[in-house]
Amino acid sequence: MLNATTLVHAGRPRTLVHPGAFNPVRIQARHSPGARHLRLCLQPGRSLFDALVQPLQAMGICSASTTILGGDFDHFVYCVATPDATGRALIAYSQPLSAGPAALVFGNATLGKRQDGSPIVHCHAAFRTGSGQMRGGHVVTEACIVGPAPIAVLVTSLDGFELRVAFDPETNIPLLQPLSEEHHV
């Protein structure tokens, strides 16, 4: 019997079956007539969220794709994906886990807007804990504090459309989705 967490092996490696209606269009794409590429330095002592959002908003960037090139954090908090106990979705995030001081090896973060229009940063990263263990997961950006040295981030603005959290009927969870300019609030 198949359920939301069943892995199907039909001639392909590990196919995950989401509980909602299947959407044959896997990538929702939008065209942008232009984009800005820049390098940003996250400032020490600030949360990852504030260090990323505030300077980008000051430049008029509300949606972006970023690559965090690595650096030290005085405090690092993350979650991991666990099976959703309710069965409504494939996964749910664990309770936040504190790694204490950590060295981010590499991460990707997406800047967009919540349903109410406030900023959101969705970030996944690989990092090394103070005891040397390698970990990875969903980063709680508001709780991660940049360490003593600035951290370099490569930014590509997504001009001409925005990323906004909206309910996804296939996964049954809210996801960042591209919306064209006429949908901007």
Question: Could you say what each language-model-derived stretch is?
Answer:
Residues 36-38, 62-64, 123, 149-151:
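Structural beta-strand/beta-sheet cores of well-ordered domains, especially the beta-sheet scaffolds
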Residues 128-185:
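Mixed-charge, glycine-accented linear interaction segment located at domain edges/termini
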Residues 7-36:
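N-terminal, Lys/Arg- and Ser/Thr-rich interaction peptides
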Residues 36-42, 139:
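Flexible, glycine/proline-enriched loop segments at strand-loop-helix junctions
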Residues 41-107:
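Short, well-structured hydrophobic secondary-structure segments
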Residues 92-152:
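Long, charge-patterned amphipathic alpha-helical coiled-coil/hairpin "stalk" segments used as oligomerization
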